[in-house]
Amino acid sequence: MKRTKSIRHASFRKNWSARHLTPVALAVATVFMLAGCEKSDETVSLYQNADDCSAANPGKSAECTTAYNNALKEAERTAPKYATREDCVAEFGEGLCQQAPAKAGMAPENQAQAQQSSGSFWMPLMAGYMMGRLMGGGAGFAQQPLFSSKNPASPAYGKYTDATGKNYGAAQPGRTMTVPKTAMAPKPATTTTVTRGGFGESVAKQSTMQRSATGTSSRSMGG
């Protein structure tokens, strides 16, 4: 009988531990998962220029100007480059292309190729930029140039896209949205020219990937 009581007590302790510790472990795991999600996202604002940013952030004019100028430099380095003005205009529309500085990320051999064909190479104008909130406990802020097309035939038509072709919705400044922190990371420098329609293809592919990822996430959350 003593042995039976001992076995029952051990079994009771084991079952009690399983019943009571499992929910605690799940709760702790959930907290860490939520914390991980919070750390992986960042709230950003979309502006067309430094004036828009300054109007939305009174007293932060200097920071807005710095972010805008940094975004312009990043655009020169990472924007899609075209050998001819016609190729750029076909992708982005009339009035949205400019000659790119010779040092704007291009490899010397590609600079020479572009200069032989048209005297220069071309890139889209920066249509706007994303900027992290002007808070953060001294951590500073980041910015990311955005591009947009006025050509209805382009997948980038009326949308804000980054240099990789990722779509951030309608090209409407003044919006605030949540993006992965990776969205604000510096993009690779453009080292080759893009063929006509090439950037639009990148936008289309990125949009397909984004829709697929959203669908997978929704199914996972729905069980």
From Swiss-Prot:
Residues 204-223 have a biased composition (Polar residues). Belongs to the UPF0441 family. Signal peptide: none annotated. Residues 178-223 are annotated as: Disordered. InterPro entries: Biofilm_formation_YgiB. This is UPF0441 protein YgiB. Residues 178-195 have a biased composition (Low complexity). It comes from the Bacteria.
